[in-house]
Amino acid sequence: MYFIDFPLEIVTSIQEVDIDTLRCHEEVVENRLSSFIDYLKTLDGDIIMSSIIVCDETMIIVDGHHRYHALKHFGLNKIPVTFIKYNSPEIKAFYDDRISKSEIVDIVNSGKLLSPKSSKHVIFDKKLNAYLPILLLSSMWHFNLKKYK
């Protein structure tokens, strides 16, 4: 088991939310999305997946655009979300600061989307003194896809 050392108050809650309340900030790689959907169709119903990571103030998806679009494809109305304090200084939109979190929020608020994989959100691990993928904050959840196929 891996433990990431970060301020626990960054994760504000884990909730099941209406999928239509979430806001994307970037496009997806279409062939990657279709491959993911095809893969999910091959599973025998039961799936364990990482929750979508979302800003608790803006409802912007921080991590999980392909998962979000796949779940929407299957008609799920409510999905588990790990809400975070996106404005935390421990979170960056990319390892090398090529894009800022405020730029992402501004782009979403303008009604536009970034190109696929324009961001790669990371969180600072105090123990390792390094930035790690923000996916590590995600919670795992179980659902049965047979209800949606």
Describe each region flagged by the PLM.
Residues 60-61:
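Short, glycine-rich nucleotide/cofactor-binding loops
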Residues 1-57, 68-149:
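Short, charged/polar connector segments at secondary-structure boundaries
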